[in-house]
Amino acid sequence: DGYRIRQVVMFGIGECARSREGGRLLKANDLPGFGKLKQFSHDGDRQFRFSEGSATLVDNRLSDADIESLIANGPPLIEQTGGYDCSCAELDELTDVANSVEGCIGAGLTGGGLGGCVLALVEENAVESLVEAVDERYYRPHSLPESSLVCSSSEGACII
């Protein structure tokens, strides 16, 4: 089967476009738009898609015909997910649970991949619902300790 270079390159190109667009969206305070970028990014990392606890393997290989179709009819570059495949079933399931909660702006893998963690951007009034959904639909069914960490962002790096 070999190394699937096409899907990895497409992921990288899409990530560059999403990074550029993400900065613009944050400056415009367009959090829903930024959240969609987080979802597209995770779709490029994912290996599985979950619905009601059931997993489906994601096949994001790109044939010549797929690439020609993307060029001719495809969505904008920021929506091209490619396939980096650095997620795992556990992170994919957590991401899908989080993204299904009303008030979750966008969730996806962050960190090293094949481990890492899921970061969810959530409206303040939906935090409790998201934590409960993750506990109820992921941690408890897998007999795992409940392990959500709620944080608030700051302005970022600055000179003190």
List the predicted regions and their residue ranges.
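C-terminal nucleotide
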Residues: 1-108, 120-160
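Small/polar glycine-rich anion-binding or flexible loop at a beta-alpha turn
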Residues: 111-118
